[in-house]
């Protein structure tokens, strides 16, 4: 298997899909990353944990419809060209 631009894009799509399907109550809450976790005090920089939680929520919110479209295109391309 050659390392091509298509395989790189497919790997990125799989990673974004993995982030998008993380369920907050089933998975994130079990590892201590639920919504009830404190973000920090006033004037403090948010930590890595809160920034990752914000990234996960943003990906799940913003990328829902584009992921459906890109996944559909990827499936059609795989069916047509193997």
From Swiss-Prot:
GO terms for biological process: brain development; organ growth; positive regulation of extracellular matrix constituent secretion; positive regulation of protein secretion; protein transport; regulation of fibroblast apoptotic process. It holds the Pfam family Yos1. It comes from the Eukaryota. The keyword Protein transport applies. GO terms for cellular component: endoplasmic reticulum membrane. It is a multi-pass membrane protein. It is found in: Endoplasmic reticulum membrane. Its main location: endoplasmic reticulum. Signal peptide: none annotated. Keywords: Endoplasmic reticulum, Membrane, Protein transport, Transmembrane, Transmembrane helix, Transport. The chain crosses the membrane at residues 2-22, 62-82. Regulator of endoplasmic reticulum secretion that acts as a key determinant of brain size. Required for secretion of extracellular matrix proteins. Required for correct brain development by depositing sufficient extracellular matrix proteins for tissue integrity and the proliferation of neural progenitors. Acts as a regulator of the unfolded protein response (UPR). Belongs to the YOS1 family. This is Immediate early response 3-interacting protein 1.
């Amino acid at each position: 298997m050659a390392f091509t631009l298509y395989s790189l894009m497919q790997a990125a799509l799989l990673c974004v899909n993995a982030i998008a399907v993380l369920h907050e109550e089933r998975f994130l809450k079990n590892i201590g990353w639920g919504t009830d976790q404190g973000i920090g005090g006033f004037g403090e920089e948010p930590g890595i944990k809160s920034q990752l939680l914000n990234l996960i929520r943003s990906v799940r919110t913003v990328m829902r419809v584009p992921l459906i479209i890109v996944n559909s295109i990827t499936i059609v391309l795989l069916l047509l060209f193997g």
